[in-house]
Amino acid sequence: MLFRFPCVTRFFQRWQQHADPHDIVAHFPVSLRTVQRWFARFEQRGDDGIAPDYHQCGQQQVQQTAPPLVEHLCQTRRDHPRWGAEMIRLELEDHYDTVPCARTVQRHLGHAGLQPAPAGRTPAAVYPRVPRAERPHQRWQMDASEDLRLKGPQRVCWLRVVDECSGAFLKTVVFAAARWEHVDRHQIQEGLRQVFAGWGLPEQFRVDNGYPWGSTGEFPPEMALWLIGLGIEMVWIPPACPQQNGVVERAQGTGQNWAAPQTCGHLAELQQRCDELERRQRERYPYRDGRSRWDVYPTLHQACRKYRRRAERSAWDVSKVWAAVAQHVVKRRVDCTGSVSLYHRTRYVGKPHIGKAVYVSLDPSGPTWVFADEAGNELRTHAADELTAERICSLSVAGRKGKRS
Protein backbone atom coordinates (compact mmCIF):
# COMPACT_ATOMS: atom_id res chain seq x y z
CA MET A 1 0.00 0.00 0.00
CA LEU A 2 2.84 2.39 0.83
CA PHE A 3 4.23 2.24 -2.73
CA ARG A 4 0.95 2.73 -4.62
CA PHE A 5 0.67 6.36 -3.47
CA PRO A 6 4.28 7.64 -3.31
CA CYS A 7 3.45 11.34 -2.79
CA VAL A 8 1.00 10.63 0.01
CA THR A 9 3.47 8.15 1.46
CA ARG A 10 6.05 10.92 1.76
CA PHE A 11 3.50 13.07 3.57
CA PHE A 12 2.84 10.16 5.93
CA GLN A 13 6.54 9.69 6.61
CA ARG A 14 6.98 13.39 7.31
CA TRP A 15 3.96 13.27 9.64
CA GLN A 16 5.59 10.41 11.53
CA GLN A 17 8.69 12.60 11.87
CA HIS A 18 6.54 15.46 13.28
CA ALA A 19 7.51 17.73 10.41
CA ASP A 20 6.13 21.24 10.08
CA PRO A 21 3.49 21.52 7.29
CA HIS A 22 5.07 24.82 6.22
CA ASP A 23 8.36 23.01 5.47
CA ILE A 24 6.55 20.43 3.34
CA VAL A 25 4.84 23.15 1.30
CA ALA A 26 8.28 24.57 0.49
CA HIS A 27 9.32 21.26 -1.12
CA PHE A 28 6.06 20.06 -2.73
CA PRO A 29 3.72 21.92 -5.14
CA VAL A 30 0.71 21.67 -2.80
CA SER A 31 -1.14 24.16 -0.63
CA LEU A 32 -0.74 24.41 3.11
CA ARG A 33 -4.39 23.52 3.61
CA THR A 34 -3.91 20.24 1.69
CA VAL A 35 -1.00 19.19 3.88
CA GLN A 36 -2.94 20.08 7.01
CA ARG A 37 -5.87 17.96 5.87
CA TRP A 38 -3.60 14.98 5.21
CA PHE A 39 -1.97 15.33 8.62
CA ALA A 40 -5.39 15.44 10.27
CA ARG A 41 -6.37 12.32 8.30
CA PHE A 42 -3.22 10.49 9.44
CA GLU A 43 -3.85 11.58 13.01
CA GLN A 44 -7.27 9.97 12.88
CA ARG A 45 -6.58 6.83 10.82
CA GLY A 46 -2.84 6.20 10.91
CA ASP A 47 -1.45 4.42 7.83
CA ASP A 48 -5.01 3.48 6.80
CA GLY A 49 -5.43 7.12 5.79
CA ILE A 50 -3.00 6.75 2.88
CA ALA A 51 -5.42 4.95 0.56
CA PRO A 52 -8.19 7.05 -1.04
CA ASP A 53 -11.84 6.48 -0.13
CA TYR A 54 -13.03 5.55 -3.60
CA HIS A 55 -15.72 3.28 -2.17
CA GLN A 56 -17.35 6.27 -0.46
CA CYS A 57 -17.47 8.53 -3.52
CA GLY A 58 -20.82 9.68 -4.87
CA GLN A 59 -24.27 9.56 -3.31
CA GLN A 60 -26.37 6.44 -3.05
CA GLN A 61 -30.09 6.96 -3.32
CA VAL A 62 -31.93 4.56 -1.05
CA GLN A 63 -35.10 4.52 -3.14
CA GLN A 64 -36.68 6.38 -5.98
CA THR A 65 -39.08 9.23 -5.35
CA ALA A 66 -42.66 7.99 -5.16
CA PRO A 67 -44.76 9.00 -8.20
CA PRO A 68 -47.47 10.69 -6.06
CA LEU A 69 -44.80 12.84 -4.43
CA VAL A 70 -43.35 13.75 -7.84
CA GLU A 71 -46.80 14.76 -9.05
CA HIS A 72 -47.33 16.79 -5.87
CA LEU A 73 -44.09 18.73 -6.26
CA CYS A 74 -44.83 19.39 -9.94
CA GLN A 75 -48.31 20.63 -9.07
CA THR A 76 -46.81 22.86 -6.38
CA ARG A 77 -44.62 24.47 -9.04
CA ARG A 78 -47.69 24.97 -11.26
CA ASP A 79 -49.56 26.60 -8.38
CA HIS A 80 -46.56 28.70 -7.35
CA PRO A 81 -44.47 29.29 -10.48
CA ARG A 82 -42.11 31.68 -8.68
CA TRP A 83 -41.16 29.24 -5.91
CA GLY A 84 -37.67 27.76 -6.00
CA ALA A 85 -36.76 24.15 -5.27
CA GLU A 86 -35.97 24.82 -1.60
CA MET A 87 -39.35 26.42 -0.95
CA ILE A 88 -41.13 23.56 -2.73
CA ARG A 89 -39.19 21.04 -0.65
CA LEU A 90 -40.21 22.79 2.58
CA GLU A 91 -43.83 22.77 1.40
CA LEU A 92 -43.61 19.00 0.85
CA GLU A 93 -42.19 18.47 4.35
CA ASP A 94 -45.56 19.55 5.72
CA HIS A 95 -47.22 16.60 3.93
CA TYR A 96 -44.59 13.80 3.77
CA ASP A 97 -42.26 12.17 6.27
CA THR A 98 -39.40 11.95 3.75
CA VAL A 99 -38.81 14.34 0.88
CA PRO A 100 -36.03 14.52 -1.74
CA CYS A 101 -33.28 17.10 -1.65
CA ALA A 102 -33.57 20.37 -3.56
CA ARG A 103 -31.39 19.09 -6.41
CA THR A 104 -33.67 16.09 -6.89
CA VAL A 105 -36.68 18.40 -6.91
CA GLN A 106 -35.02 20.42 -9.66
CA ARG A 107 -34.38 17.25 -11.66
CA HIS A 108 -38.01 16.14 -11.45
CA LEU A 109 -39.20 19.61 -12.45
CA GLY A 110 -36.87 19.53 -15.44
CA HIS A 111 -38.16 16.12 -16.53
CA ALA A 112 -41.73 17.45 -16.28
CA GLY A 113 -40.88 20.36 -18.57
CA LEU A 114 -41.48 22.98 -15.90
CA GLN A 115 -39.22 25.96 -16.30
CA PRO A 116 -37.09 26.96 -13.29
CA ALA A 117 -38.23 29.84 -11.10
CA PRO A 118 -37.02 33.23 -12.35
CA ALA A 119 -33.71 34.29 -10.89
CA GLY A 120 -33.40 37.37 -8.72
CA ARG A 121 -32.61 40.72 -10.27
CA THR A 122 -28.96 41.48 -10.84
CA PRO A 123 -27.75 44.94 -9.82
CA ALA A 124 -27.54 47.40 -12.69
CA ALA A 125 -24.45 49.08 -11.29
CA VAL A 126 -21.91 48.75 -8.51
CA TYR A 127 -22.96 50.87 -5.53
CA PRO A 128 -20.93 51.85 -2.48
CA ARG A 129 -21.13 49.15 0.16
CA VAL A 130 -23.20 50.14 3.19
CA PRO A 131 -22.01 48.71 6.53
CA ARG A 132 -24.43 46.02 7.65
CA ALA A 133 -25.59 45.27 11.18
CA GLU A 134 -23.31 42.83 12.98
CA ARG A 135 -25.87 41.12 15.22
CA PRO A 136 -29.61 40.39 15.16
CA HIS A 137 -31.93 43.21 16.19
CA GLN A 138 -29.14 45.76 16.05
CA ARG A 139 -30.87 47.37 13.08
CA TRP A 140 -34.12 46.66 11.31
CA GLN A 141 -35.14 47.76 7.85
CA MET A 142 -38.74 48.45 6.86
CA ASP A 143 -40.40 49.35 3.61
CA ALA A 144 -43.88 49.44 2.12
CA SER A 145 -45.12 47.84 -1.09
CA GLU A 146 -48.36 49.06 -2.63
CA ASP A 147 -50.91 48.29 -5.33
CA LEU A 148 -50.84 44.52 -4.74
CA ARG A 149 -53.70 42.93 -6.69
CA LEU A 150 -55.69 40.13 -5.06
CA LYS A 151 -57.70 37.49 -6.91
CA GLY A 152 -60.67 39.84 -7.23
CA PRO A 153 -60.73 43.57 -7.92
CA GLN A 154 -59.38 44.48 -4.48
CA ARG A 155 -55.89 45.92 -4.16
CA VAL A 156 -53.89 46.13 -0.94
CA CYS A 157 -50.51 47.27 0.34
CA TRP A 158 -48.23 45.96 3.06
CA LEU A 159 -45.45 47.03 5.40
CA ARG A 160 -42.53 44.61 5.73
CA VAL A 161 -40.01 44.61 8.58
CA VAL A 162 -36.74 42.67 8.17
CA ASP A 163 -33.76 42.11 10.45
CA GLU A 164 -30.74 43.60 8.68
CA CYS A 165 -28.09 41.24 10.08
CA SER A 166 -29.77 37.90 9.41
CA GLY A 167 -32.18 38.93 6.68
CA ALA A 168 -34.99 37.24 8.61
CA PHE A 169 -38.54 38.26 7.72
CA LEU A 170 -39.92 39.51 11.04
CA LYS A 171 -43.40 40.71 10.14
CA THR A 172 -45.52 41.79 7.20
CA VAL A 173 -48.63 43.83 8.00
CA VAL A 174 -51.23 43.98 5.22
CA PHE A 175 -53.51 47.01 4.87
CA ALA A 176 -56.75 47.36 2.91
CA ALA A 177 -55.72 50.51 1.02
CA ALA A 178 -54.16 50.19 -2.43
CA ARG A 179 -51.94 53.26 -2.05
CA TRP A 180 -49.55 53.41 0.89
CA GLU A 181 -50.09 57.12 1.38
CA HIS A 182 -53.79 56.43 1.96
CA VAL A 183 -53.12 54.21 4.99
CA ASP A 184 -53.93 56.10 8.17
CA ARG A 185 -50.86 56.83 10.29
CA HIS A 186 -52.55 55.37 13.38
CA GLN A 187 -53.03 52.05 11.57
CA ILE A 188 -49.33 52.03 10.73
CA GLN A 189 -48.51 52.79 14.36
CA GLU A 190 -50.64 49.86 15.53
CA GLY A 191 -48.95 47.63 12.96
CA LEU A 192 -45.53 48.55 14.34
CA ARG A 193 -46.79 47.85 17.85
CA GLN A 194 -47.66 44.33 16.68
CA VAL A 195 -44.09 43.90 15.48
CA PHE A 196 -42.66 45.21 18.76
CA ALA A 197 -44.96 42.99 20.83
CA GLY A 198 -43.67 39.91 19.03
CA TRP A 199 -39.99 40.78 18.69
CA GLY A 200 -39.13 43.56 21.13
CA LEU A 201 -37.47 46.84 20.19
CA PRO A 202 -34.47 47.16 17.86
CA GLU A 203 -31.59 49.52 18.44
CA GLN A 204 -32.03 51.23 15.06
CA PHE A 205 -34.45 51.52 12.16
CA ARG A 206 -33.15 52.09 8.62
CA VAL A 207 -35.87 53.70 6.50
CA ASP A 208 -36.31 55.64 3.28
CA ASN A 209 -37.65 59.17 2.94
CA GLY A 210 -41.24 58.26 2.19
CA TYR A 211 -44.46 58.48 4.17
CA PRO A 212 -44.84 58.46 7.18
CA TRP A 213 -41.30 58.60 8.60
CA GLY A 214 -39.44 60.31 5.76
CA SER A 215 -37.11 63.22 6.44
CA THR A 216 -35.39 65.13 3.64
CA GLY A 217 -33.49 67.69 5.65
CA GLU A 218 -36.58 68.74 7.62
CA PHE A 219 -37.37 68.04 11.24
CA PRO A 220 -38.28 64.36 11.79
CA PRO A 221 -42.01 63.68 11.21
CA GLU A 222 -44.27 62.62 14.05
CA MET A 223 -44.03 58.88 13.34
CA ALA A 224 -40.25 59.08 13.56
CA LEU A 225 -40.54 61.14 16.76
CA TRP A 226 -42.66 58.42 18.33
CA LEU A 227 -40.07 55.77 17.44
CA ILE A 228 -37.24 57.93 18.77
CA GLY A 229 -39.10 58.28 22.07
CA LEU A 230 -39.10 54.48 22.32
CA GLY A 231 -35.30 54.58 22.23
CA ILE A 232 -34.96 53.60 18.56
CA GLU A 233 -32.37 55.49 16.53
CA MET A 234 -33.61 56.46 13.08
CA VAL A 235 -31.24 56.01 10.12
CA TRP A 236 -32.49 57.66 6.92
CA ILE A 237 -30.99 56.57 3.62
CA PRO A 238 -30.21 59.24 0.99
CA PRO A 239 -33.04 60.02 -1.45
CA ALA A 240 -33.31 57.77 -4.51
CA CYS A 241 -30.86 55.20 -3.06
CA PRO A 242 -33.00 52.10 -2.38
CA GLN A 243 -29.90 49.88 -2.62
CA GLN A 244 -28.86 51.23 0.79
CA ASN A 245 -32.00 49.58 2.14
CA GLY A 246 -31.20 46.49 0.14
CA VAL A 247 -32.12 43.80 2.65
CA VAL A 248 -35.77 44.76 2.84
CA GLU A 249 -35.90 45.71 -0.86
CA ARG A 250 -34.81 42.18 -1.77
CA ALA A 251 -37.25 40.80 0.79
CA GLN A 252 -40.07 42.65 -0.93
CA GLY A 253 -39.44 40.87 -4.22
CA THR A 254 -38.97 37.48 -2.59
CA GLY A 255 -42.04 37.95 -0.44
CA GLN A 256 -44.24 38.76 -3.42
CA ASN A 257 -42.91 35.74 -5.32
CA TRP A 258 -43.66 33.42 -2.40
CA ALA A 259 -46.95 34.88 -1.18
CA ALA A 260 -48.41 35.42 -4.69
CA PRO A 261 -51.05 37.99 -3.62
CA GLN A 262 -52.91 37.54 -6.91
CA THR A 263 -53.96 34.04 -5.78
CA CYS A 264 -55.47 35.22 -2.47
CA GLY A 265 -59.19 35.85 -2.31
CA HIS A 266 -59.14 38.40 0.50
CA LEU A 267 -56.86 40.35 2.80
CA ALA A 268 -57.03 37.90 5.71
CA GLU A 269 -55.87 35.04 3.48
CA LEU A 270 -52.87 37.05 2.31
CA GLN A 271 -51.99 38.01 5.88
CA GLN A 272 -52.15 34.38 7.01
CA ARG A 273 -50.01 33.25 4.08
CA CYS A 274 -47.39 35.93 4.83
CA ASP A 275 -47.24 34.82 8.47
CA GLU A 276 -46.71 31.18 7.48
CA LEU A 277 -44.06 31.91 4.86
CA GLU A 278 -42.16 34.26 7.18
CA ARG A 279 -42.00 31.56 9.85
CA ARG A 280 -40.77 29.10 7.26
CA GLN A 281 -38.13 31.55 6.00
CA ARG A 282 -36.80 32.13 9.52
CA GLU A 283 -36.98 28.67 11.02
CA ARG A 284 -36.59 26.17 8.16
CA TYR A 285 -35.34 27.72 4.92
CA PRO A 286 -31.63 26.86 4.34
CA TYR A 287 -29.47 29.91 4.93
CA ARG A 288 -25.90 28.87 5.69
CA ASP A 289 -24.41 25.38 5.41
CA GLY A 290 -27.91 23.95 5.26
CA ARG A 291 -28.93 25.57 8.55
CA SER A 292 -31.76 28.02 8.95
CA ARG A 293 -31.42 31.57 10.26
CA TRP A 294 -33.04 30.34 13.46
CA ASP A 295 -30.08 28.00 14.04
CA VAL A 296 -27.32 30.30 12.78
CA TYR A 297 -28.43 33.24 14.95
CA PRO A 298 -29.65 32.02 18.37
CA THR A 299 -30.15 35.63 19.53
CA LEU A 300 -32.64 36.19 16.73
CA HIS A 301 -35.42 34.63 18.79
CA GLN A 302 -36.02 37.76 20.85
CA ALA A 303 -34.65 41.29 20.94
CA CYS A 304 -32.88 42.37 24.12
CA ARG A 305 -35.29 45.25 24.71
CA LYS A 306 -38.75 43.91 25.43
CA TYR A 307 -41.90 45.85 24.65
CA ARG A 308 -45.29 45.86 26.34
CA ARG A 309 -48.15 47.94 25.02
CA ARG A 310 -49.46 48.78 28.49
CA ALA A 311 -46.06 50.00 29.64
CA GLU A 312 -45.33 52.09 26.55
CA ARG A 313 -46.14 55.46 28.09
CA SER A 314 -43.99 54.84 31.17
CA ALA A 315 -41.02 53.69 29.07
CA TRP A 316 -41.41 56.40 26.44
CA ASP A 317 -38.91 59.29 26.88
CA VAL A 318 -39.74 62.71 25.44
CA SER A 319 -36.27 64.04 26.25
CA LYS A 320 -34.82 61.72 23.59
CA VAL A 321 -37.13 63.32 21.07
CA TRP A 322 -36.10 66.84 22.03
CA ALA A 323 -32.42 65.89 21.81
CA ALA A 324 -32.93 64.39 18.34
CA VAL A 325 -34.85 67.41 17.02
CA ALA A 326 -32.22 69.75 18.49
CA GLN A 327 -29.64 68.23 16.13
CA HIS A 328 -31.45 69.73 13.12
CA VAL A 329 -31.38 73.30 11.82
CA VAL A 330 -34.01 74.08 9.19
CA LYS A 331 -34.08 77.02 6.80
CA ARG A 332 -37.36 78.88 6.28
CA ARG A 333 -38.46 81.87 4.18
CA VAL A 334 -40.67 84.37 6.03
CA ASP A 335 -43.99 84.81 4.20
CA CYS A 336 -45.99 87.97 3.55
CA THR A 337 -47.57 87.82 7.01
CA GLY A 338 -44.20 87.65 8.76
CA SER A 339 -44.63 83.97 9.62
CA VAL A 340 -43.09 80.59 8.87
CA SER A 341 -44.50 77.07 9.11
CA LEU A 342 -43.26 74.34 11.46
CA TYR A 343 -45.02 70.98 11.43
CA HIS A 344 -47.80 72.73 9.45
CA ARG A 345 -48.28 75.20 12.28
CA THR A 346 -47.76 78.93 11.70
CA ARG A 347 -45.11 80.67 13.82
CA TYR A 348 -44.83 84.46 13.76
CA VAL A 349 -41.31 85.86 13.29
CA GLY A 350 -42.02 89.52 12.50
CA LYS A 351 -43.02 91.65 9.51
CA PRO A 352 -39.60 93.34 9.30
CA HIS A 353 -38.25 89.95 8.19
CA ILE A 354 -40.74 89.37 5.35
CA GLY A 355 -39.02 87.68 2.40
CA LYS A 356 -35.87 86.95 4.38
CA ALA A 357 -34.39 83.57 5.23
CA VAL A 358 -34.41 82.49 8.87
CA TYR A 359 -32.94 79.43 10.54
CA VAL A 360 -34.99 77.43 13.03
CA SER A 361 -33.59 75.21 15.75
CA LEU A 362 -34.86 73.71 18.99
CA ASP A 363 -33.58 74.49 22.45
CA PRO A 364 -34.28 71.19 24.25
CA SER A 365 -34.24 72.77 27.70
CA GLY A 366 -37.64 74.39 27.05
CA PRO A 367 -38.34 73.02 24.64
CA THR A 368 -38.30 76.26 22.66
CA TRP A 369 -38.16 77.08 18.97
CA VAL A 370 -35.35 79.55 18.25
CA PHE A 371 -35.47 81.70 15.10
CA ALA A 372 -32.23 83.33 13.93
CA ASP A 373 -31.07 85.27 10.88
CA GLU A 374 -28.21 84.30 8.59
CA ALA A 375 -25.71 86.01 10.91
CA GLY A 376 -26.88 83.89 13.84
CA ASN A 377 -28.69 86.70 15.65
CA GLU A 378 -31.72 85.52 17.57
CA LEU A 379 -34.94 87.05 16.22
CA ARG A 380 -37.68 85.40 18.20
CA THR A 381 -38.52 82.33 20.27
CA HIS A 382 -41.70 80.28 20.60
CA ALA A 383 -42.61 77.52 23.01
CA ALA A 384 -42.55 74.18 21.19
CA ASP A 385 -45.92 73.18 22.62
CA GLU A 386 -46.54 70.69 19.80
CA LEU A 387 -43.62 68.53 20.99
CA THR A 388 -45.35 67.15 24.07
CA ALA A 389 -45.37 63.46 24.92
CA GLU A 390 -49.13 63.28 24.51
CA ARG A 391 -49.16 64.84 21.05
CA ILE A 392 -46.22 62.81 19.79
CA CYS A 393 -47.58 59.46 21.01
CA SER A 394 -50.98 60.26 19.51
CA LEU A 395 -49.33 61.38 16.24
CA SER A 396 -50.97 64.80 16.41
CA VAL A 397 -47.84 66.97 16.24
CA ALA A 398 -48.59 68.37 12.80
CA GLY A 399 -51.45 70.82 12.44
CA ARG A 400 -53.31 72.26 9.49
CA LYS A 401 -51.64 74.84 7.32
CA GLY A 402 -52.76 78.39 7.96
CA LYS A 403 -53.73 77.77 11.56
CA ARG A 404 -51.93 80.25 13.79
CA SER A 405 -50.32 78.88 16.96
Where are these regions (language model features)?
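Short, amphipathic alpha-helical "recognition" segments used to contact nucleic acids or chromatin
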Residues: 2-19, 70-79
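Basic, flexible linker segments flanking DNA-binding modules
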Residues: 49-142, 147, 299-302
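Key DNA-contact positions within bacterial/archaeal DNA-binding proteins
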Residues: 33, 37, 103
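Charged alpha-helix within mobile-element recombinases
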Residues: 173, 216, 223-315, 364
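Mobile-element integrase/transposase regions
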Residues: 63, 98-99, 109-168, 182-194, ...
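C-terminal, beta-rich DNA-binding module of retroviral/retroelements integrases
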Residues: 282-405
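A short acidic/small-residue loop/turn micro-motif
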Residues: 163-164, 175-183, 386-387
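Short alpha-helical "recognition helix" segments of helix-turn-helix
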Residues: 23-28, 88
